[in-house]
Amino acid sequence: IKPWLHKPGQMPLTPPEKYRSDDCLWFFNAIPAYVAETGDLGFYRKVLPYSDAGEDTVLAHLRRALQFNLDRTGRNGLPSGLAADWNDCLKLGYRGESVFVAFQVRLGLATYADVAHRLALPDEAAWAQRELATLDEKIQRVCWDGDWFIWAIGEDGTVFGTHRYPEGQVYLNTQVWAVISGAATTPQRDRCLDTVRERLATEWGAAICDPPFEKTPVAVMRAVLFNPGSKENGGIFSHTQSWAVLA
């Protein structure tokens, strides 16, 4: 994904150390919204170039976006965090896992299965449903902390966003995306959103996490570089408020 400069079919490859785990998954928010607005289901069959070379249908671009994250997973089989997920301060690498991206992948798989069904592509729909069932099992086994969903798992196995870790126990993104993606069961949905209200809600909006980071190693969580209550260290982001509203 090239958000700032894009010459289709002519861009240099992104070096692996700069891969971001969330970038290609925003297609699953943007493209279905475009198709719903225009009514043009045929857009999924339109052939468009890749960033560097080659071309394929929009649907194939979506499949490739999913495969990118399915091919890069950590010790629990959840998506790798890579250079960053949406949170630029979170440095998880290839072995650390992003629960936020797991929810993005879940939404992507569910969307892909629905689109493939509507395009009369049963094999593609079945593939997505199988991957979805596998991911759901991993999410339920690894990511629920009792009252909310965890944030991430570091390369060394440290769990962030758990009641057992003293900082950043509750993370807004994983609560609201658990609901948006459909990963949360009904009891989980109700409880994690109650936790958002109890722990993150302020008169100015929902904070991104609570409590802020003060002692967590900076190599993994660069939010610790910011004052508590600012930016990714417990600040209030306009972008995340919209997700909370959707949830």
Located regions from the model:
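Catalytic cores of carbohydrate-active enzymes
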Residues: 104-223
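Generic structural signal for residues positioned in beta-strands
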Residues: 26, 79-80, 177, 195
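Non-catalytic C-terminal accessory modules of carbohydrate-active enzymes
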Residues: 198-201, 229-233, 246-247
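Carbohydrate-binding/catalytic loop surfaces
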Residues: 2-23, 51-53, 57, 76-98, ...
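Aromatic-rich carbohydrate-recognition surfaces in CAZymes
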Residues: 1-77, 98-106, 189, 235-247
